Amino acid sequence: MLLEFQDSIIRGDCRKILSGLSANSVQLTITSPPYRNAIDYEAHIEKNGYYRGKARKETGEYLDEMVQIFNEHIYRVTKDGGYCCIVIGNEVVNGTIIPLPHMLLSKLVQPFGNWNLHEEIIWHKVTGGTNRYGSFVINPYPKYFRANIMHEFILVLRKGDVNSGRTNRNDILPAKHEEFTKEIANSIWHIAPVPPGYIEHPCPFPEEIPYRLMKLYSYEGDLVLDPFNGSGQTTKVAHNFARRYMGIDLMDEYVSLAKFRLDKESIHIRPDALIAKWQKIRSHYLPNL
């Protein structure tokens, strides 16, 4: 049952939908799981609803659900040599950081899970993040410091060993091009977030993230999955770059939004770097005598 799912955006629970998808059919998954407690998505749908900070799930319950989805359902439908990229950040509860990315990762990768960790990329948001430094401005004393949170993690998981699925050598990437040597070559990606209110969704990741991941981990014609499709950033980028796509979301409003955005909006891929060009600088260390 593959053809009926290709190039589709479906409303439903991804666990039920994926149970009807053939095993070993997805080359690449790109997704950002729903925030555990930071976002109330139902309240966001109600235009006047306050949607931040509504506690809904205990950490253990959230992790168990995510482990079931990624270790069982998504792993089963992923091809040998395929990849799963999870965009996820820490949460802050009552002044304490909850390291959800690392807690989840410890349960997904071998020896405790099914996946292999291929890469861990830090998404540096550059122009936006969670403001926590203000409390230190008000109370400029030791032990009051809180850093602004300007990053999330992109966990790149692989099914199979490092050489799995490397038989196709079409679509050579310009590995010496500046986009790849300056921007993608390192484990920190500098990508500005989507401006607040630009898309009718509380937390869309920028299109540049799925664009890069599709370029690096898939070929044209491959099936790309987003089981938490939301506003449709993954499916939109896949559609525009000749990938087959499959998006799943629980809410009718987001399914309709994602379908609408497939052809109605242009792609937003930044042509220039957000950080200065690299250059050698003089060392401040004095030579040893």
Predicted regions located by residue number:
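S-adenosyl-L-methionine
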Residues: 1-17, 259-289
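Core catalytic lobe of class I
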Residues: 1-257
